[in-house]
């Protein structure tokens, strides 16, 4: 079972936040896009191609997406990837390079910078929160 994590030493709980609140809106086309993004995280995704895939102009797509979710499509995608990476980081046997590729990035250092910018923690620091503590003695 997953535990709810609260880090009392932090002013922000952003590292442990979730993207699920951004799913409650009335735009069915954007809900379909969100489902598609969740299924294709490991792929290289360009926003203009995504708009075309869902039969919208890039401008209309970005406007509708932001109106529905409160985020730009790129920021939403990045946050979705960070959320997936968090789940994978909770598995101690998964290497960071493998996780980076699994969420659609090739460059581990670029992904680490994004992860830190979104959570306030490095991937390693985030992972350490879920490792069993060893008794000191």
Positions of predicted regions on the chain:
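An amphipathic alpha-helical interaction segment
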Residues: 1-21, 32
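Short amphipathic alpha-helical surface patches that mediate protein-protein
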Residues: 2-6, 116, 131
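Basic, amphipathic alpha-helical hairpins
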Residues: 11-14, 29-46, 65-69, 86-95, ...
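N-terminal positioning helix adjacent to the helix-turn-helix/winged-helix DNA-binding module
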Residues: 22-33, 69, 78-81
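Terminal helix-turn-helix DNA-binding modules in bacterial transcription factors
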Residues: 43-49, 56, 66-108, 128-137
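Key DNA-contact positions within bacterial/archaeal DNA-binding proteins
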Residues: 59, 109, 124
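Short hydrophobic/aromatic patches on the structural cores and recognition surfaces of FHA
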Residues: 61, 85, 111
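Non-catalytic terminal regions of proteins
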Residues: 81, 112-113, 122-127
